[in-house]
Amino acid sequence: VWVPELNGILFSDVPNNKAYLWTEKKGLSLFLYPSGMTNHAPNNKSDGSNGLGLDSDGNLILCQHGDRSISRLNNWFFEEPKYEVLVDHFNGKWLNSPNDLVFDKQGSIYFTDPPYGLRNGDEDDLKELNFNGVFKWSAREEVKLVEKNMSRPNGIALSLDEKTAYVANSDPTNDVIMAFDVLDDGFSNGRIFFDGNILSQTREGLFDGLKMHSSGIIFATGPGGVLLLDSMGVHLGTIMPGKKTANCTFDKDERYLYLTSTDVLARVKLN
């Protein structure tokens, strides 16, 4: 996520329970440790944070794999980070391992909850939910399940008018991006927005992160790199960094696209 106050990009190193900051002036530095596994939740895997976002007040909100929660960072620039858990249960059961998030204009958080942060995935003894869902949370209401029929919900984005939600399904047997109508009480009219199953047979990677550009073009990390898709799901082209790409985001002015590719943070000039 781009952080204007730091004039830099924050990104997660999931398996090492760390988050890093990169700025033009200072380069790379460790920003958070631990980033997502603080022994808050029962877990036999030590993954850290995954998806990151800023709320309307500039607070850092984290999808924490290890702690199985959506949390807020309460102290910037301190040696030991302190987190406030926003949501970690649904109907009295632990979430799986929140993966990615997006905010709507009212400040609600939509987030995905696949089992990647559990050592044995769907078969893990600590998994309490019998599905991998997409949820909506806000400070004004209880967490709400909006979609439960995807096998591996991952990256998530909203259309510019917030009437459509896009969710990546990172499943090697069903590598697609789904689109849903956004209603007050959940998602409806689920349909395949883009089918990547043929591409993923010849290109490395599955659909993962999604980012909506102000032009309405969706930047989707997936087979071969970062796919550019228009609002009708037409594949406009692919940015191919040569490595499996996990996530991407823009800087404040959308001059650059930043992407995390295996062991590399890269950027591509857009304008």
Describe the residue ranges of each PLM region.
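Sequence-structural signature of mature extracellular/luminal beta-sheet repeat domains
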Residues: 1-271
